[in-house]
């Protein structure tokens, strides 16, 4: 019986009758039950690793056949069909116990062996470089695979096996350690220089992958995520990542010298020599069925390797450059080397992409720096530059790199990457900042009444900014903006550009209103009223303007002339025209608003005061061209001025000096009417005092010759408020009197 037990042909445990089925057992049987009862929790509570109770290791065919035959013979019982003697039953129980203990010991030995292998593997694995000897990875993988001893297949119950989950966790941890070691060894091999020894070391490592994958799949069936496989793409990515870093370090050194082109050729030659053997090894492993890796042919591997290699090189080189190197200069140097050296297509593509990324990075950095400087200058107050605003120059410098980026289609595609701001968005930000800065600075200058700085802003700084905004508008409105977000930003740029285009006209309008306001305040404070304008007529006309006229006109107009110095006449004319119109208009409005009445002497004095405007324009310090002065004096406001003076100079004679006239229209001479010369712009000096009683005939002839020149009728210079100006005369006709009905009245005041 002992020999039968050693042979392993024992009956199966699954059909053993329970010992508790014999209530009348002996003491020895009860002792046996007490000894074996401690193991029942293992027998009935042990989970099965696979469905149907099949163990997850291969079972020999002969063992299975003997096992089934013995089980069938055991079920048949004795040949005679009689009952089993009690002594034989006791021996049978002892034999079953011994058989069970033997199976448990064999199972414990196998578990201890695999646990010892897993613990030893986790302790001895290190991230060091691979040694020159044979790789221990295949042996480690075989040690961790479960191969139970012969006869140790223990089926405890239907669908149950003994040890899968006992070893699942340590083997899963060991598989993770193996994965880390393989990855580190692949990285270490990638850092090695190209040599024949590199291929042999890589071959040893790659041929160990099938055993690792077998272990990984079995461990994965019990512990999901225990370890990852090493497909061809991962192997190539690990190798090219390290080799790309090595190539990038060589190129970084060459960028600081002058041998970049030669270094590129040398790197490509070395990788080209190494590539056939390396791809042959990777392709051989990929084609093996046990590895489970499938990839295309050698051409696909070749292209994939070159692409991954130079992509890793470009990424590493970009990191090596850092923010302390000029990306634009590096991109130009690298582009020049690519154009001179004959390189693989994948190399040129990846390095050209790196050049564009560097240019994009340079543009973004320069825009950021310039934008921050512009914001700092805008917050710093007025610029110290005498001819231009420093903030305007900084804002203007933001546009050229953005325009270059929009003009370059390939660079524009790189800008459209989600991680980087697009040039269209930066252009919109620049336009918004420019518009807000201009409006704020214009309001600041006008509030402080600094017309020189204001005119410098709109005549010197605004035109270049407007030109850049229009260029950005033309590029942003093209159909090449394919992205929807770019099209939306382009619409916003169009709206802002339209607002900026209206700034010159709107600014001059606001400037004219401010000039009118300042002049009105000055006339309100300094222009006299009352008797000053109602004096009797003197024999000599006034020869000097009043003090208030020079004070108010020079206070408002001189800063304007100072701000326009150095500008071309085309830029001076609009601002001066607005300023003159505002000042003279405020002068006339002040007279009408306060109802100042003028005698003939007062009207002549007012005419002399108006001459201050022309005298100021003719001063040499302002360097105004004669054509510009002539253009300014052609303004319609001076025609209104001449009309107002004409109304005031049409003074009727006082009542005491009026005598009865014959009823004839041609005899009406009591009203002195002046005529303007041919040019209304020179009428400020052509309106002379009319003839009054007591003047000499010589003075009368001279006055008539001065005022008798050809020109338009006085009605041509009178505006809609003609009656208001006529009402300001000291001596007036009746409101209903008309010149052609003068013969109907006996006197002007009747």
Swiss-Prot record:
InterPro entries: CC142_N, CCDC142, CCDC142_C
Residue ranges the record marks as coiled coil: 87-110
Superkingdom field: Eukaryota
A Pfam family hit: CCDC142
Annotated keywords: Coiled coil
Polar residues: compositionally biased ranges: 693-707
Magnesium is among the record's keywords: no
Residues spanning the signal sequence: none
Residue span of region Disordered: 1-29, 687-714
Keyword Coiled coil listed: yes
UniProt-listed PANTHER family: COILED-COIL DOMAIN-CONTAINING PROTEIN 142
Name the UniProt record assigns to this protein: Coiled-coil domain-containing protein 142
């Amino acid at each position: 019986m002992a020999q039968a037990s050693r042979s392993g042909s024992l009956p199966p445990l699954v059909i053993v009758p329970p010992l508790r089925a014999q209530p009348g057992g002996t003491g020895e049987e009860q002792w046996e039950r007490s000894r074996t009862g401690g193991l029942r929790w293992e027998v009935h509570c042990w989970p099965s690793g696979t469905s149907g109770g099949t163990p997850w290791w291969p079972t020999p065919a002969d063992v299975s056949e003997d096992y089934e035959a013995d089980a069938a013979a055991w079920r048949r019982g004795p040949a005679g069909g009689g009952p089993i003697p009690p002594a034989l039953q006791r021996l049978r129980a002892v034999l079953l116990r011994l058989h069970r203990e033997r199976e448990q010991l064999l199972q414990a030995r196998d578990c201890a062996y695999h646990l010892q292998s897993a613990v030893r593997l986790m302790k001895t694995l290190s991230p060091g470089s691979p040694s020159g000897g044979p790789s221990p990875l295949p042996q480690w993988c075989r040690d961790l695979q479960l191969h139970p001893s012969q006869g140790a297949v223990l089926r405890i119950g239907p669908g149950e096996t003994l040890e899968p989950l006992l070893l699942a966790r340590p083997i899963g941890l060991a598989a993770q350690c193996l994965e880390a070691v393989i990855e580190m060894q692949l990285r270490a091999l990638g850092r090695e220089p190209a040599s024949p020894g590199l291929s042999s070391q890589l071959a040893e490592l790659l041929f160990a992958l099938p055993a690792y994958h077998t272990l990984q799949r079995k461990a994965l069936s019990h512990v999901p995520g225990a370890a990852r496989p090493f497909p061809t793409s991962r192997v190539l990515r690990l190798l090219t990542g390290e080799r790309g870093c090595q190539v990038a370090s060589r190129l970084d050194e060459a960028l600081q010298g002058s041998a970049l082109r030669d270094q590129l050729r040398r790197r490509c030659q070395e990788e080209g020599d190494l590539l056939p053997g390396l791809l042959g090894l990777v392709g051989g492993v990929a084609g093996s069925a046990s590895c489970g890796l499938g990839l295309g042919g050698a051409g696909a591997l070749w292209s994939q390797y070159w692409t991954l290699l130079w992509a890793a090189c470009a990424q590493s080189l970009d990191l090596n450059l850092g923010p302390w190197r000029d990306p634009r200069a590096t991109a130009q140097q690298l582009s020049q080397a690519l154009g001179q050296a004959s390189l693989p297509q994948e190399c040129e593509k990846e390095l050209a992409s790196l050049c564009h990324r560097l240019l994009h990075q340079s543009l973004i950095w320069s825009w950021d720096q310039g934008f921050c400087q512009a914001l700092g200058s805008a917050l710093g107050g007025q610029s110290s530059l005498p001819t231009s605003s420093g903030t305007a120059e900084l804002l203007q410098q933001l546009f050229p790199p953005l325009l270059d980026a929009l003009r370059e289609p390939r660079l524009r595609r790189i800008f459209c990457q989600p991680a980087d701001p697009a040039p269209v968005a930066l252009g919109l930000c620049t336009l918004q900042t420019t518009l807000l800065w201009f409006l704020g600075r214009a309001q600041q200058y006008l509030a402080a009444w600094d017309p020189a700085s204001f005119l410098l802003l709109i005549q010197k700084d605004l035109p270049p900014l407007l030109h850049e905004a229009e260029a950005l508008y033309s590029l942003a409105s093209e159909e090449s903006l394919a992205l929807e977000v770019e099209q939306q930003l382009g619409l916003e740029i169009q709206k802002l550009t339209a607002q900026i285009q209206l700034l010159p006209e709107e600014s001059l309008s606001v400037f004219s209103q401010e000039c009118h306001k300042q002049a009105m305040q000055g006339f309100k404070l300094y222009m006299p009223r009352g008797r000053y304008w109602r004096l009797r007529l003197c024999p000599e006309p006034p020869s000097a303007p009043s003090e208030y006229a020079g004070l108010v006109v020079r206070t408002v107009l001189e800063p304007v002339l100072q701000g326009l110095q150095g500008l071309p006449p085309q830029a001076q004319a609009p601002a001066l025209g607005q300023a003159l119109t505002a000042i003279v208009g405020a002068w006339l409005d002040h007279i009408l608003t306060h109802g100042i009445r003028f005698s003939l002497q007062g009207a002549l004095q007012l005419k002399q005061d108006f001459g201050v405007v022309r005298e100021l324009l003719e001063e040499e310090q302002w360097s105004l061209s004669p054509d510009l002065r002539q253009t300014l004096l052609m303004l319609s406001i001076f025609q209104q001025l001449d009309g107002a003076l004409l109304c005031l100079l049409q003074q009727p004679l006082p009542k005491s000096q009026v005598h009865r006239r014959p009823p004839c229209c041609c005899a009406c001479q009591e009203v002195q009417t002046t005529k303007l010369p041919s040019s209304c712009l020179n009428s400020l000096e052509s309106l002379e005092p009319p003839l009054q009683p007591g003047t000499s005939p010589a003075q009368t002839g001279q006055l008539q010759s001065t005022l008798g020149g050809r020109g338009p009728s006085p009605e041509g210079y009178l505006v809609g408020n003609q009656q208001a100006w006529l009402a300001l005369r000291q001596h007036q006709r009746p409101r209903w009197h008309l010149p052609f009905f003068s013969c109907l009245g006996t006197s002007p005041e009747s």
